[in-house]
Regions:
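N-terminal DNA-binding module of tyrosine recombinases/phage integrases
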Residues: 1-54
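Charged catalytic carboxylate motif
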Residues: 7, 31, 52, 85-89, ...
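Residues within well-ordered alpha-helical secondary structure of globular protein domains
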Residues: 10, 31, 59-62, 135-138, ...
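A short secondary-structure junction motif
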Residues: 11-15, 35, 39, 43, ...
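DNA-binding alpha-helical recognition surfaces that contact promoter or target DNA
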Residues: 27, 55, 85, 92, ...
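Alpha-helical scaffold segments in carbohydrate-active enzymes
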Residues: 31-35, 59, 82-99, 154
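Short, conserved phosphate-binding/catalytic loop or strand-edge motifs used
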Residues: 46-61, 109-114
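Basic, Lys/Arg- and aromatic-enriched nucleic-acid-binding interface segment
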Residues: 66-80, 84-86, 99, 103-161, ...
Length: 170
């Protein structure tokens, strides 16, 4: 019988390192280190049932948010969006546990998640983009913003660009 913390270490090294990008890898490890291992890391994988999962979600709702080196906690307690991410990660991990024949069924299937409110994002029009670029004084930031708007690139994609990826004539 394997502890959840040990199982997640194996899961991340055998699955996560191959399937996730750098940003996803960091955020998943933060969830594991801040919200999973401290609460249920010492439990055995085989001991997790849907009832245990429901109790875990209740515990998370009363758990203080953790600030990390890249993200400051914006709520007092773990938000419903973060709980959704944690359960999604654990559902994926326990799906692998079923595949690896560690457990017979996934206790994270059919989980009832707390209601999450999603904020509608504002979409910038051409005038708003032009205003932002005009007000940008930093030349490197200007290039990054321009690439982001023109090519729909995310920050990680922009930071990962190298000259051999740039084809100006095309």
């Amino acid at each position: 019988n394997q502890k959840i913390s040990d199982f997640l270490y194996d899961f991340v090294s055998l699955y996560g390192e191959k399937k996730w990008g750098v940003s996803m890898y960091d955020s998943q490890n933060s969830l594991i280190n801040n919200y999973i291992n401290p609460i249920i890391g010492d439990m055995e994988v085989q001991a997790v049932t849907p009832r245990v999962v429901d109790g875990y979600i209740q515990t998370l709702q009363k758990t203080a948010s953790v600030s990390t080196k890249t993200r400051k906690a914006t709520t007092t307690y773990v938000s419903n969006q973060t709980i959704e991410k944690i359960i999604k990660l654990l559902r994926c991990a326990f799906k692998q546990a079923v595949r690896w024949e560690i457990i017979g069924r996934n206790p994270f299937d059919n989980v009832v998640l707390p209601k999450t409110e999603y904020k509608k994002r504002d979409i910038w029009d051409a005038e708003m983009i032009r205003t932002a670029l005009d007000k940008c004084a930093d030349s490197k930031l200007y290039v990054a913003m321009n690439l982001s708007f023109a090519c729909s690139l995310r920050m990680g994609e922009i930071l990962g660009l190298t000259w051999d990826n740039v084809h100006i004539s095309e």
